Amino acid sequence: MNSLQVGVGISDRAAPGDDPVADAVTAEAFGYDFVSAFDHPVAGAATAEALGYGPMAAGRPVRTYPTYETQTLLTWIAARTTRIGIVPRVLAVPFRRPVLVAKTAESLQRLSRGRLILGLGAGYRDDEIRAAGAPAQSARARQDGLEDAIAITRAAWARSVVRYRGAVYSADDLDLEPKPVAPIPIWLGAQGPRGLALTGRVADGWIPFLRFARPDRIPAMLEQIRAASVAAGRPADAVRAVYSVPVRLDPRARSTAGLIAGSAADIVEQLQGFTELGFTGFDLMPRREQIPALAEDVVPALRELRIPGPRELPTPALLAAGAAS
């Protein structure tokens, strides 16, 4: 049995009044296990609305929402903290070649002393992908690209010469140095059947978003992941399930399809229900000013929950082993 792990999702917004680095420092001071950030380098107004940002910035309508580049943001956070894990939630592969994914992840893992968990996804916003100048891809091709990217990334971390031919991405005599000093977990944000099967076969974790993966769908989704894990010769619980959940601590507020709200007791009760679905961790996404209050009033009760889980997040021994040289 493992204690439930709790992280906090910080904003990637670069609008006036936002300070995600300060929020991450606060999260570490209040004992959270990790911080995460979305990856939307070209976030149109439709994306902002879907993620709950709203269509406004600095009090005016926006066509493209102001955001930080996620890996740059997390690197700066790593430099300002010492313990807390860092998770891109999740890097969209169409924006980055696999060799860049592999190289930047190794560098960030080394510089952060082993604190990186690499979140990856196939990408889902065609408007963002087109705006960034990436080649147009079908949903099937994006899934092919994600699978290729994971294969190339893991091979580059482990082997001196990588030759790979994939449906979307390939590598010829690729040799990345240095290699990671410790394993870098890969979490996927998959939603559909093919992505869930890939998660079960190759991933270390699954980090779905409440607004896109409703609780009533979770049992079937987890069953797909577990079946794929077993078919690949892995344990059924090989994949850690971490739910990204927007939360609001307010006794007057009520939960909606995309938000868990209420008193501290209300929130704990609802999150406990999610552990009964099979989640072994939470990525809480509060308003920035509520990060301390959640840590004091909600997180201790969550940590009292004992749940079966496949593995813990990076340990202090792992962090020390990954010291930058």
Locate predicted features.
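Active-site-adjacent structural elements that line small-molecule/cofactor binding pockets in enzymes
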Residues: 1-325
